[in-house]
Amino acid sequence: MSLNTDLTIALDVMGGDQGPLITISSAITAISHQPNLHLILCGDEIIITETLAHFEITKENLATHKQLSIFPTSQVVLMSDKPIVALRTKKDSSMRKALDLVHEGRAQACVSAGNTGALFSMAHFVLKNIPGVERPALISSLPTHDKDKHVFMLDLGANVFCDSHVLYQFGVMGSVMAEQVDGINKPRVALLNMGEEAIKGSDHIKLAALELTENKDINYVGFIEGSDIFSNKADVIVCDGFVGNVALKTCEGVARLVYEKSKTAFSASLVAKLFGSLLKPSFKKLFKTMNPDQYNGASLIGLRGIVVKSHGNANSSAFLSAIEEAVKEVERQVPEKIKTSLEHGFTCR
């Protein structure tokens, strides 16, 4: 479908725990915010059509819709599917077809809330790595203590174990992401570890530290502990996917716990309700910066195309954030800038 639009993104609307109602709701909100955005809804045509009807978009309306189209698929990648099985047997899945559309140049990015391992395997197979990159990684931004500043963290789940050289490459790519996308001059790169001392940690962590130290193009600042993830001591935090995923989900859980506990505390008595009403504007602003939904959307960095992974349990607000992240990366030409930077000084040895 040829359209006069500046941005085209393929959505795996069948992926995730919440189903098409959430992903399609987010899609409709996204196009209302950005008139030059075209979204291709990949998935079961009947289910998509029925879901769109809830938003007063009929099949007849869709035929002439300038911002939405359907790419029918016959399969769904389940959360329980093993990555290699999904890669071999789910070639007509909504996830695979969304990636194929990016590979074919019919879409500029793919967004999915589906099975992380399957998405990683399929994206790696379909889109291939940027030359010089051994392993792509999931990267996302997190809030820090300083207002309007955040920290990039990778890997968040794509690679359960990483050797020292892969961690080194993550540091290189994360540095490029922070510098090229956020405009940070000489981003501070740190390795997540069980302590700041040089003697702490496993051998592969120590070897990665040596490699990063030797690359003078990287502003490596040493080890950082989990308690300092939000301290603004680094612009990029590097770890393997197992540690990163556990750390991320723990942080999200704590943020929601604080939010719920605060609501309970401010409704415990009449006096508490009074103070709560007075402090409500300040707390609303605070929790807006802490809300995990706005940081939903981890990018598979290191690929030749843009792939954004939303959490499997994402609500409509969170999936919308993932779409917006994809839009931003398309506009800023992230893969091209990473490739250029790798070719001009940030060489992965």
UniProtKB/Swiss-Prot annotation:
Name of this protein: Phosphate acyltransferase
GO BP, sorted A to Z: fatty acid biosynthetic process; phospholipid biosynthetic process
Cellular compartments per GO CC: cytoplasm
Pathway: Lipid metabolism; phospholipid metabolism
GO molecular function, one term: phosphate:acyl-[acyl carrier protein] acyltransferase activity
Secretion signal, residue range per the UniProt entry: none
Keyword annotations from UniProtKB, A to Z: Cytoplasm, Lipid biosynthesis, Lipid metabolism, Phospholipid biosynthesis, Phospholipid metabolism, Transferase
Family according to the record: Belongs to the PlsX family.
Function: Catalyzes the reversible formation of acyl-phosphate (acyl-PO(4)) from acyl-[acyl-carrier-protein] (acyl-ACP). This enzyme utilizes acyl-ACP as fatty acyl donor, but not acyl-CoA.
Enzyme type, top EC level: transferase
Family matches, as InterPro entries: FA_synthesis (IPR003664), Phospholipid_synth_PlsX-like (IPR012281)
Organismal lineage: Bacteria, Pseudomonadati, Pseudomonadota, Gammaproteobacteria, Alteromonadales
Oligomer status and interactors: Homodimer. Probably interacts with PlsY.
Localization per record: Cytoplasm
Catalytic reaction(s) noted: a fatty acyl-[ACP] + phosphate = an acyl phosphate + holo-[ACP]
Enzyme Commission number: 2.3.1.274
A Pfam family annotated for this UniProt entry: FA_synthesis
Gene that encodes it: plsX
